[in-house]
């Protein structure tokens, strides 16, 4: 009888020991994100979280997102430390526009071959994003799937749940003629438009690590982590009558602003109210990208757009400025039955 080789999971490309080593590496940073409502620690079959007692009629708000092909750029440049912040930001910023306070976050990390150092760097970034937004990292899934991804390439997805008082949900229904639009500045392209970014780099034959822009590598501008606005916006909501908030993500101005506008209203954006950050000017020039396409693909320096009564505008700008945001009046809401929901002039 011939002796057959005894195969193991590791022979098939799945290293359980590496997965366990990763869990040991991240326990400390995950613990720092813990909210008092969270029960139990990492390792359970499910994460338990009570609702904060201050809510009378709590409504749960959920969201999921990724970071798109910004991830490819980060892998090519071997810079993994801020991708986790991007992942959290894309989820929690979507929650806060409805007035929701993020409660907990889960991540999904999939790779062809688990590199513990890379994964730990990404998850440390996720924990940092959770700290910035005040939510707990309660669990996640690390999937090592040989044959599904090339080598140590990886993908990440995030899932977040928040809570808002039912009577305080922000849904855009209060937006009306005469409202003022306040902009909160972005940190860069955030996590959208990176397939176009990468195409521009390819066509222009630009090395983002050796090309300088405003005294630092272009790569620093392109990989700047997505700004997390949660804590500052929650404070704004407590002090100002906010009618609507739009998170400028994929689809830019043309797609995201109409999502919070009632029928028969139009957002009029004053293009002269701000200057695009240098990275957007570089992208437009290097890629010969039209103005319309820029506003459809990128945030062009505007991460959040907030609609509120004109009488509250100065107060809102002062409060956000005091909190470190770059805030300014960017436009107004007009009554209109036009099919053009957004006008930039």
From Swiss-Prot:
GO molecular function, one term: ATP binding
GO BP: 'de novo' IMP biosynthetic process; adenine biosynthetic process
CDD domains xref list: PurM (cd02196)
Key word Translocase present: no
Pfam family, one: AIRS
UniProt cross-references to InterPro entries, sorted A to Z: PurM-like_C_dom, PurM-like_C_sf, PurM-like_N, PurM-like_N_sf, PurM_cligase
SUPFAM superfamilies: PurM C-terminal domain-like (SSF56042), PurM N-terminal domain-like (SSF55326)
Chief localization: cytoplasm
Localization terms from the record: Cytoplasm
UniProt-listed Enzyme Commission number(s): 6.3.3.1
Keywords from the UniProt entry: ATP-binding, Cytoplasm, Ligase, Nucleotide-binding, Purine biosynthesis
Catalytic activity: 2-formamido-N(1)-(5-O-phospho-beta-D-ribosyl)acetamidine + ATP = 5-amino-1-(5-phospho-beta-D-ribosyl)imidazole + ADP + phosphate + H(+)
This protein's pathway: Purine metabolism; IMP biosynthesis via de novo pathway; 5-amino-1-(5-phospho-D-ribosyl)imidazole from N(2)-formyl-N(1)-(5-phospho-D-ribosyl)glycinamide: step 2/2
Cell wall biogenesis/degradation in keyword set: no
UniProt GO cellular component terms: cytosol
PANTHER family: TRIFUNCTIONAL PURINE BIOSYNTHETIC PROTEIN ADENOSINE-3 (PTHR10520:SF12), TRIFUNCTIONAL PURINE BIOSYNTHETIC PROTEIN ADENOSINE-3-RELATED (PTHR10520)
Family label: Belongs to the AIR synthase family.
The protein, known as: Phosphoribosylformylglycinamidine cyclo-ligase
Provenance organism: Enterobacter sp. (strain 638)
């Amino acid at each position: 009888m011939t002796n057959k080789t005894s195969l193991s999971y590791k022979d098939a490309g799945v290293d359980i020991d590496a997965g366990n080593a990763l869990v040991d590496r991240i326990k400390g940073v995950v613990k720092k994100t813990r909210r008092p409502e969270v029960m139990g620690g990492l390792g359970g079959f499910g994460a338990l979280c009570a609702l904060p007692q201050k809510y009378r009629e709590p409504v749960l708000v959920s969201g999921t997102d990724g970071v798109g092909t910004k991830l490819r750029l980060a892998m090519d440049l071997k810079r993994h430390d801020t991708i986790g912040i991007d992942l959290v930001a894309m989820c929690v910023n979507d929650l806060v526009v409805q007035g929701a306070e993020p409660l907990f976050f889960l991540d999904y990390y999939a790779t062809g071959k688990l590199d513990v150092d890379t994964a730990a760097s990404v998850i440390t970034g996720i924990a940092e994003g959770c700290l910035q937004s005040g939510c707990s990292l309660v669990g996640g899934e690390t999937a090592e799937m040989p044959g599904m991804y090339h080598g140590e390439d990886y993908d990440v997805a995030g899932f977040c749940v928040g809570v808002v008082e039912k009577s305080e949900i922000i849904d855009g229904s209060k937006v009306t003629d005469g409202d003022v639009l306040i902009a909160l500045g972005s940190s860069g392209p955030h996590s959208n438009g990176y397939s176009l970014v990468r195409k521009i780099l390819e066509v222009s034959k630009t090395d983002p690590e050796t090309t300088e822009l405003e005294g630092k590598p272009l790569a620093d501008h392109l990989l700047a982590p997505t700004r997390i606005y949660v804590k500052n916006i929650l404070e704004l909501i407590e002090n100002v009558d906010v009618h609507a908030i739009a998170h400028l993500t994929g689809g830019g101005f043309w797609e995201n602003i109409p999502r919070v506008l009632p029928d028969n209203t139009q957002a009029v954006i004053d293009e002269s109210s701000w200057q695009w950050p240098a990275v957007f000017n570089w992208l437009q020039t290097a890629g010969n990208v039209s103005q319309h396409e820029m506003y459809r693909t990128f945030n062009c320096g505007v991460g959040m757009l907030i609609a509120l009564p004109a009488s509250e505008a100065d107060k809102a700008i002062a409060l956000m400025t005091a909190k470190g945001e770059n805030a300014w009046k960017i436009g107004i809401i007009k009554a209109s039955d036009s099919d053009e929901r957004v006008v930039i002039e």
